[in-house]
Amino acid sequence: MMLLGFTMLPALSKWDIRGWGETNALNGPTWSLMWEYLANILYALFIRHFSKTMLGIFVAFSAFLTLNLALNLDVFGLFSTRSYAIYTVIGGWSTTPDQLCIGISRLLYPFFAGLLLSRINKLIKVKAGFWWCSLLVAALLVAPHFGTGDTAWINGAYDAFCILLMFPLIVSMGAGSSVTGRSVKVCKFFGEISYPLYITHYPLIYMQVAWASHHKDLPLGTHIC
C-alpha cells in the first residue's frame, strides 16, 4: 500500500481499510494527484501537439461532462446510486465506473481550459489583481450549500457556474497581474508550500478521526483543542 502511495498508483478495492473506497487508504488525496499525473503524461505524449481548435473542442466536451456531473444529468447512466452527493461534484477517489467518470469529469475541464487560456494568451490585467482574486475566491468558497429537495439543483448550477466561468476568470486575472514588494515573498512561500501541505495533511486527519472515535465522551473543547 505504501509503495502504491509513493507511485500514485490506485490500490485494489479489496485493500480498502475504512470502507471509504479510496484509491490509497494511507493518503486519500493521492487520488487527485493520480489524475493529474495521468494528464501530464498524456500532455507530454499527445496533448501538447493539439491546435487551438482541438483544445476548444475538448474544452466544450469537458464542460459538458462537468454539467452532466453537477446537474446530475447522468447521460451515461452511472450516477443512480449517488444520492448522497447529488447536485455536487463530490467524488472521484475510487476505481468503480461511476467514480472514474467523476474523476475524469473533475479533471478535464480545468486542465483543458487552462491549456486553452495559456495558448490564446488572453489575460486580464487589473490593478491589485492579487487582492481581487483573493476576494473572489473567498466569496465563492464561503457560499453555503444551496437548495434542498426539489431545489437541490441550484447547488449543482452554482458549482457549474464556479467551475466553468468564475475559476477560469480568476486564473486569467491572476496570470495577468503581478505583485511587488513584500507580497512577492509571501506569495512565493504560500505557492511553494501549498503542494507539500496538500499531500501530507490527510494522514493527520486520519489520526484525529481515530483519536476522536476512541474519546467520544470527552468535552467538545477537548476535541477542538
Language-model-detected regions and their locations in the chain:
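Hydrophobic alpha-helical membrane-insertion segments
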Residues: 1, 63, 197-198
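Membrane-interface helix-loop-helix regions
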Residues: 1-37, 69-97, 161-175
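Feature marks short, surface-exposed loop/turn motifs that line or immediately flank catalytic pockets
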Residues: 10-12, 65, 206
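Alpha-helical transmembrane segments in multi-pass integral membrane proteins
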Residues: 15-20, 46-50, 90-225
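Glycine-rich loops and low-complexity Gly/Arg-rich segments
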Residues: 30-32, 58-59, 223-224
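Small-polar-interrupted transmembrane alpha-helices in polytopic inner-membrane proteins
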Residues: 54-74, 133-141
